[in-house]
Amino acid sequence: LNAGLFVYLLKFCSERGYSVDTEETDYGLPISSKKIDTYEFNNFLEKIGLPFMPREYQYDAVITALQRSNAILLSPTGSGKSFIMYLLMQYYRAFLNTKNQKVLIIVPTTSLVEQLTSDFKEYGMDVEKDIHKIYSGKDKITKKNVIISTWQSIYKNPRAWFQKFGMILGDECHGFKSKSLSSIMNKATEAKYRYGFTGTLDG
């Protein structure tokens, strides 16, 4: 069962008087949440060399997302979506990446691959050291810890290729073709942290 369907399953069963038994795994339950130490988070923000601090709504968005291992964040144009993504990614790398896994960021266009890379550099990241970009026939094998790719470039990759990722961030997730995105997510079985970003939600 896809995690996103869990809430609908609970509603379906509740309306029909069915009980639901769950067995928690290392990934937790889709609707479970954990407490984020805001003192630790504030110290983290001070130490990562940001050119500016997050606005209140950006701060709240990151904290809310971190309380869950998967979520869709509604982030309209001008809200600083790439900055929210950056903070989530860097917090994961600093505190949650216990298995030394990589981060995969999926975008719909090559221009967004370059834009995110440029944004992350502006936020203080050493992009030459840490980021590998995949599109238009670029090499899909790298030792770098963060991969930014178009979904078109990777959705046909074998399952083994996705096992190195512990976090997946999807930009403009409402525009992904459902079968392609499902293929990626189903193959990335080791990715405990999954977040989608969109400026609009359909339905």
Predicted regions and their residues:
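Conserved pre-motif I regulatory segment
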Residues: 28-74
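Conserved SAM-binding loop
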Residues: 2, 54, 105, 147
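ATP-binding Walker
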Residues: 79
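SF2 helicase catalytic motif II
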Residues: 151-203
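Inter-Walker segment of RecA-like/P-loop motor cores
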Residues: 121-159
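Residues at the beta-strand->loop junction immediately N-terminal to the Walker
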Residues: 74-75, 106
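Conserved Walker A/P-loop ATP-binding site and its immediately adjacent core
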Residues: 82-87, 91-92, 99-122, 203
